[in-house]
Design a protein with these regions (language model features):
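Internal active-site segments that recognize and position negatively charged phosphoryl groups
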Residues: 1
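A detector for short metal-coordination/catalytic motifs
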Residues: 4-7, 12-105
């Protein structure tokens, strides 16, 4: 999305679960639209710590037949995220999200 007002700096490890250092670490953040921020926070999508690809949860796949699914979620499944020039998302933090927050495949 190219509309800065619709982008959110999202924590990979949630604020409540983070140490003081993690809360301020740029590597504990990713830039997402409001829709994907909510999906990420709720564990409906995750980012692989191995190759930075997006995985959809089975809970989200229940909506695969809905009109909006392909446009908003099917189109991002298995895509690699656009990496920032500096402060790439920390692989350990992404692993935490995948293991503890993501609702699984």
């Amino acid at each position: 999305i190219n509309v800065p007002d619709l982008l959110i700096a999202s924590h990979i490890i949630p604020w409540a679960d983070s140490t003081a250092e993690q809360r301020l670490a740029p590597e504990n953040g990713i830039c997402l639209s409001a829709l994907y921020d909510k999906a990420f926070d709720r564990g409906l999508i995750t980012i692989s710590p191995d190759d930075y690809t997006i995985t959809l949860s089975s809970a989200l796949l229940e909506y695969e037949t809905k009109d909006y699914f392909d446009k908003h979620f099917g189109s991002i499944a298995r895509n690699k995220i656009i990496m920032p020039i500096e402060h790439a998302p920390n692989r350990d933090y992404l692993a935490y999200h995948k293991e503890r927050i993501f609702k699984g495949v």
